[in-house]
Amino acid sequence: MIAYIHGKLLEATDKSCIILTPGGVGYELFLTLSAISTLPESGSDVTFYVHSVIREDAFDLYGFPCFDDREVFRTLISVDRLGPKKALAILSQFGPKDLQDLVFREDVKTLSIVPGIGPKSARQILWSLKDKMETLKSATVRSGACPVEGDRSEFLDALSGLRNLGYGDDEVRDFLKDIFDEEPDLDAGGAIRVALKKISQNK
């Protein structure tokens, strides 16, 4: 089972990337939106912790920039009827600390913004995660070691805000990445304002 990959970034889409290892083998990894948004240029060295999902008709690999994000992912998929695709969608919206806060507050409404998760499913997920809070807490304490550029929560809040304004992820993700690279301490509101200005200048 593949647990860790180091190689060069070959290609990337809005859902996955292909890593070329020194042995000449290319692996496709499914990533969270935050991981996709912080990928370097093609040809750059990258490293991911990996969770492998093996089925009769598929062999899917899910990549995470740090060990603790992978452990939170594994905690999520241990919830009954919560598969890897939905778990990845949750981590695309919420980091470990955000997720811990949702569980503590039993915030069904906020979790329900994740595509494919309605109020009933959100309530079941939050209830199930209450028994797994220690794992989430441990990951939250150590998650500062994750090599993610800028503040992930602010990035995702800005991305969500621009979606609400009618912009697609593909339209704004590169703008936001550049904005947070230049000003990593910027909050979501400031990033949205800068992004809107850049978008208008590029029309």
From Swiss-Prot:
Residues 66-144 are annotated as: Domain II. GO terms for molecular function: ATP binding; four-way junction DNA binding; four-way junction helicase activity. GO terms for biological process: DNA recombination; DNA repair. Keywords: Cytoplasm, DNA damage, DNA recombination, DNA repair, DNA-binding. CDD domains: UBA_RuvA_C. Pfam families: HHH_5 (PF14520), RuvA_N (PF01330). Residues 1-65 are annotated as: Domain I. The keyword Chloroplast does not apply. Its main location: cytoplasm. Coiled coil: none annotated. InterPro entries: DNA_helicase_Holl-junc_RuvA_I, Hlx-hairpin-Hlx_DNA-bd_motif, NA-bd_OB-fold, RuvA, RuvA_2-like, RuvA_C, RuvA_C_sf. Residues 145-155 are annotated as: Flexible linker. Residues 155-203 are annotated as: Domain III. It is found in: Cytoplasm. One of its GO terms (cellular component) is Holliday junction helicase complex. Homotetramer. Forms an RuvA(8)-RuvB(12)-Holliday junction (HJ) complex. HJ DNA is sandwiched between 2 RuvA tetramers; dsDNA enters through RuvA and exits via RuvB. An RuvB hexamer assembles on each DNA strand where it exits the tetramer. Each RuvB hexamer is contacted by two RuvA subunits (via domain III) on 2 adjacent RuvB subunits; this complex drives branch migration. In the full resolvosome a probable DNA-RuvA(4)-RuvB(12)-RuvC(2) complex forms which resolves the HJ. Has three domains with a flexible linker between the domains II and III and assumes an 'L' shape. Domain III is highly mobile and contacts RuvB. The RuvA-RuvB-RuvC complex processes Holliday junction (HJ) DNA during genetic recombination and DNA repair, while the RuvA-RuvB complex plays an important role in the rescue of blocked DNA replication forks via replication fork reversal (RFR). RuvA specifically binds to HJ cruciform DNA, conferring on it an open structure. The RuvB hexamer acts as an ATP-dependent pump, pulling dsDNA into and through the RuvAB complex. HJ branch migration allows RuvC to scan DNA until it finds its consensus sequence, where it cleaves and resolves the cruciform DNA. Belongs to the RuvA family. HAMAP family: DNA_HJ_migration_RuvA (MF_00031). This is Holliday junction branch migration complex subunit RuvA. It comes from Maridesulfovibrio salexigens (strain ATCC 14822 / DSM 2638 / NCIMB 8403 / VKM B-1763) (Desulfovibrio salexigens).
